[in-house]
């Protein structure tokens, strides 16, 4: 999908705040300086009465004299009086009609004139945002004693009125996009309303440079800006004979550098091998019957191989990519949990499988009219939660990735030894995780890499929970000289179409990996490749972190790369 950034309309914004402006100002509101913003001149200020009264008078006058003249015109037709003969009252009515029409015609140009007046006065309110920032610097106890920051005047009188309406609660904030028809303008107005309501500044949260049309109805509601996350690259990752530069969006120092070192070690040893074991997204509705006997009847019906083809036809109608693979049932009293599993092409597939499940439930109602559908999701799926069913059965893409690291590379690149890595993996990732009662967490930090790649490529960050299920294995081979390392990840949930993948930044990261959009030649191959790359990146991250721990370098490296000396000095002072 071709996403283009739309140039936003020019709104008045506060000027940049220099560092010196805060050094020389001790209090936000000095007594000897008037910080109140000067009123913005309006085209309507020239009117003798307030704008709303003037409008009311001319609207009333226009419709009143129009009605009067129409009434007189009908009377003249009935009495055969010539139309060109007019009385003094009729003449006054005609003049009033023309005057009110001219005013109403000009009224709609006031906002247009106002935009030029406002543009010439761009320096107004230069100290408004610094005052809000100064309030941010004060302790909460002092902040409570201070008046709220003065509002920023919007670029037009109409926008200013809308902001006031949102603040007062007359206009719902969520309805701005539909009412205005301009997503950027809606976000700008909502942003200013939030600042006035909370009395806190959003100066550090960017508004410009983002296509708000692209997220309408699919990615985010009620936007007021966007968060910037730095994106680094690790690699090249040599996986299945191909090189990949892996984008990682993170704020954790040392993470990208560590993963990059793992990629370097894997590359030096001939690369890694990734194998896709399974590909199927799941959804599990919960239905209830009056008795456990009736629930078991449906269970036996669904598990009968003779009925599977019929159910598959009904399910597959939801999409040309959806293909039902299996149905798994579990009972709890008279409640039945039905776990549907299907392939979903290059999409992550939650919406696709949900539509198919809805079709099957409607089909089953004819044979089981006493079935009560409690919910389309009964948590037997299981989505965005650590669950044994995902760890055992898998969800999304199940991938295993392995590599053989030679003794020479272990010593020179990873700065440790094969026996030290094998022992640490057993005591930390296996025994230590068992002591902790871990569920799918038999690894060092798989979630770190999964989250970073997910955010960069537009995946659902919440699905990092089950996608990070991973068991890391290390074994000495070739008479103890070399290291065999593998990661097994049964539930990587990714897609290359839909959701956040269509955003410009995330689409660029997918393009960097060569998996942007849907693969038209082989449906689903792009998402499967992305899952394999995620597993390969986790392999590199596990190898590097475990080596750092084995060599005693973890604390030293994090103090160097993951702790800002500038921040620490501020805390110390």
From Swiss-Prot:
Cytoplasmic topological intervals: 67-92, 550-573
Q: List, alphabetically, the CDD domains matched.
A: HMG-CoA_reductase_classI
**Membrane topology classification:** Multi-pass membrane protein
Spans within the Lumenal topological domain: 1-45, 114-528
Respond yes or no to whether keyword Transmembrane helix is given for this record.
yes
The reaction(s) catalysed by this protein are:
(R)-mevalonate + 2 NADP(+) + CoA = (3S)-3-hydroxy-3-methylglutaryl-CoA + 2 NADPH + 2 H(+)
Induction behaviour: Induced in the hypocotyl of a 4 days-etiolated seedling and reversed by light exposure within 2 hours. Inhibited by dark treatment in 7-days-old seedling, where true leaves are emerged. Repressed by darkness in roots and leaves, but increased ginsenosides accumulation. Triggered by methyl jasmonate (MJ). Repressed transiently by mevinolin (Mev). Influenced in roots by relative humidity and photosynthetically active radiation (PAR), and in leaves by rain and soil water potential.
Which family does the similarity line name? Belongs to the HMG-CoA reductase family.
Q: What name goes with this protein? A: 3-hydroxy-3-methylglutaryl coenzyme A reductase 1
């Amino acid at each position: 999908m071709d996403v283009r950034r739309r140039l936003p309309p020019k709104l008045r914004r506060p000027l940049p705040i220099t560092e010196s402006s805060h050094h020389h100002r001790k209090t936000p509101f000095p007594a000897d300086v008037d910080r109140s913003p000067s009123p913005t001149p309006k085209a309507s200020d020239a009117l003798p009465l307030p704008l709303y009264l003037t409008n009311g008078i001319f609207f009333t006058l226009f419709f009143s004299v129009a009605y009067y003249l129409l009434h007189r015109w009908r009377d003249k037709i009935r009495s055969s009086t010539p139309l060109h003969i007019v009385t003094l009252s009729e003449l006054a009515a005609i003049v009033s009609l023309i005057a009110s029409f001219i005013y109403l015609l000009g009224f709609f140009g006031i906002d247009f004139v106002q935009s030029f007046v406002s543009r010439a006065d761009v320096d107004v309110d230069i100290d408004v945002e610094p005052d809000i920032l100064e309030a941010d610097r004060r302790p909460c106890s002092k902040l409570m004693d201070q008046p709220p920051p003065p509002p920023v005047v919007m670029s037009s009188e109409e926008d200013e009125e809308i902001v006031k309406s949102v603040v007062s609660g007359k206009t719902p904030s969520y309805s701005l996009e539909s009412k205005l028809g301009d997503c950027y303008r809606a976000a700008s107005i909502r942003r200013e309303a939030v600042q006035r309501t909370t009395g806190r500044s959003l100066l550090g949260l960017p508004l410009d440079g983002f296509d708000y049309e692209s997220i309408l109805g699919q990615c985010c509601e009620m936007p007021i800006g966007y968060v910037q996350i730095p994106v680094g690259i690790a690699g090249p990752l040599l996986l299945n004979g191909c090189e990949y530069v892996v984008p990682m969006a993170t704020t954790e120092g040392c993470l990208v550098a560590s993963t990059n070192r793992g990629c370097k070690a894997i590359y030096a040893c001939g690369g890694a091998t990734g194998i896709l074991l399974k590909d199927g997204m799941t959804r599990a509705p919960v239905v209830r019957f009056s008795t456990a006997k009736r629930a078991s009847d449906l269970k036996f019906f669904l598990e009968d191989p003779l009925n599977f083809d019929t159910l598959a036809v009904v399910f597959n109608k939801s999409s040309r990519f959806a293909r039902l693979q299996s149905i798994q049932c579990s009972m709890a009293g008279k409640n039945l949990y039905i776990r549907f599993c299907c392939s979903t092409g290059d999409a992550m597939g939650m919406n696709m499988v949900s539509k198919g499940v809805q079709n099957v439930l409607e089909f089953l109602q004819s044979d089981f009219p006493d079935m009560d559908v409690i919910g389309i999701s009964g948590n037997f799926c299981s989505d965005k939660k650590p669950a044994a069913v995902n760890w055992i059965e898998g969800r999304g893409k199940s991938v295993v990735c392995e590599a053989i690291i030679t003794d020479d590379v272990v010593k020179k690149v990873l700065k440790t030894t094969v026996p030290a890595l094998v022992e640490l993996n057993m005591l930390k990732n296996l025994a230590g995780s068992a002591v902790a009662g871990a569920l799918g967490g038999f690894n060092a930090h798989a979630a770190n890499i999964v989250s970073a790649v997910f955010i960069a490529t537009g995946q659902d960050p919440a699905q990092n929970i089950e996608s990070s299920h991973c068991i890391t294995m290390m074994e000495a081979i070739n008479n103890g000289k070399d290291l065999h390392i593998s990661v097994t990840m049964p539930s990587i949930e990714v897609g290359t179409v839909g959701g956040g993948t269509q955003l410009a930044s995330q689409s660029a990261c997918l393009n960097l990996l060569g998996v942007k959009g849907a693969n038209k030649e082989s449906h689903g191959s792009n998402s499967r490749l992305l899952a394999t790359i995620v597993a390969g990146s986790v392999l590199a991250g596990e190898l590097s972190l475990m080596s750092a721990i084995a060599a005693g370098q973890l604390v030293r490296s994090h103090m160097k790369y993951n702790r800002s000396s500038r921040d620490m000095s501020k805390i110390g002072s």
